[in-house]
Amino acid sequence: MTALGMTEKNFLQTCTPVVFRRIDVASVPFEELSLVHTIYADLMHAIGRQIIPEGGQPLPARAIYMSKERLRNGNVRVDNESAFTAALRERGVGIVYPEEMGFRDQIKLWASNPTVIGFSGASLHTSIFFPERRVITLAHGPDIWANQCLIDMANNNDAQYLYDANGLEHIGAGNGFNMNYRIRNPEQLASELAEYALS
């Protein structure tokens, strides 16, 4: 509420039944897998400025990878991600674990404007709080989840969509995830990705 400039006074609480003759409900500015309006980005940018009013210390030469390896359950996971993150770390790519960060820290990370890399997922959607971020989205196959494309388009991100030419090995559901994949050659993918991201 604070980031939106609102207090409890902006809300109506009724303790008895009430009939409203008319209620206007705004259309959604973002609809999953379907559409996004620029006003959605405007709102998110305003929230970002409220949460991090000082902005971030720019780190344009820095690349970080948003890892899911510590998630206990979720939608999609890369089974051998720890080998991949170790190889990225050796090549100078920072590793962060969004699920272990507070909301403000996640937003502050985007404010510093590094190149952010990650497998397609909701953690990359938080780029929307600051305009024109640099994002490299790794797909689990030759197609990409539309939500990331919508966020990148609305935010005017410098977005790249990549996938491993060797293909990820499809393992199936299990261990708390709806789908598991395995990188066939973590060292090779990390080497190629680090060279691409840091060049």
Predicted regions and their residues:
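The feature primarily captures lumenal catalytic ectodomains
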Residues: M1-S199
